[in-house]
Amino acid sequence: MTSIAFCNAFTVNPFLAAARRSPPPLTPLTSVALSPARKPRILAIFHPRTFPSFRVQAIAEDEWESEKKTLKGVVGSVALAEDEKTGADLVVSDLKKKLIDQLFGTDRGLKATSETRAEVNELITQLEAKNPNPAPTEALSLLNGKWILAYTSFVGLFPLLGAESLQQLLKVDEISQTIDSEGFTVQNSVRFVGPFSSTSVTTNAKFEVRSPKRVQIKFEEGIIGTPQLTDSIVIPDKVEFFGQNIDLSPFKGVISSLQDTASSVAKTISSQPPIKFPISNSNAQSWLLTTYLDDELRISRADGGSVFVLILESSPLLT
């Protein structure tokens, strides 16, 4: 009994027993033996549920090619639109540069030749055709700010710009238009400068939107600014008179006295309030049509088709 118990404690290894069995008889190559499928034993080291499951969906090749073509078409359309936008911006930028070059030396159009006027009108027409804001009154914020007049075909301004008798005393230094879209106000201003003073004439107006491009302007008052006198007179140390140099240094005491007097007079006059007067005649209204507008350039047309080219005060186009 003791020997039997001892043997039962160490059972025979089944793998060794299988290895000791005689091999099965060889099957001839000319015959095929079919045996029933046996279910293989699998040694499970990990639980099968710990492995994630994946699903693979098969797509027909034609369908995949169609999707690739669609995606390629969308990407191509976006790239083409970006290229077209970049190209259009370059064209507009080039047109503006050419326009500014043509305006150089024309004194706001006063000294422009007929050939220059024709070229300017052609460039203006091309810019109007590429207006990035075809409805300017719907983008009133772009109208805000001080706009400097660079060119006009309005003949009513030419006598003011070209009067020789006036230029001997005063010269037109700047013509501007300031727009406040929140208050619906327009201020037109002409600034004059002279040898010893400067002044300005201003008109204040209200405007109403009448169409996507047109506004109606009603002038309310005019203002004549108080002259700002130069408070110092600069006298050179010497001057040449009929080929002789005259020393002015002995007169510095007299000159200093004159400068003090001029400074006192200038402060007195400059401290006076401007002169205001109402505008109520039949010519107190006009309309303005904006045919081109971006963040630095504005082209407008007024009664009779007169054209105005204005540049925003902060624009590098003025430099």
UniProtKB/Swiss-Prot annotation:
One of its GO terms (cellular component) is chromoplast. It is found in: Plastid, Chromoplast. Its main location: plastid. Keywords: Chromoplast, Plastid, Transit peptide. Residues 1-55 form a transit peptide. May be involved in carotenoid sequestration within chromoplasts. Belongs to the PAP/fibrillin family. This is Chromoplast-specific carotenoid-associated protein C2, chromoplastic. It comes from Oncidium hybrid cultivar. The gene is CHRC2.
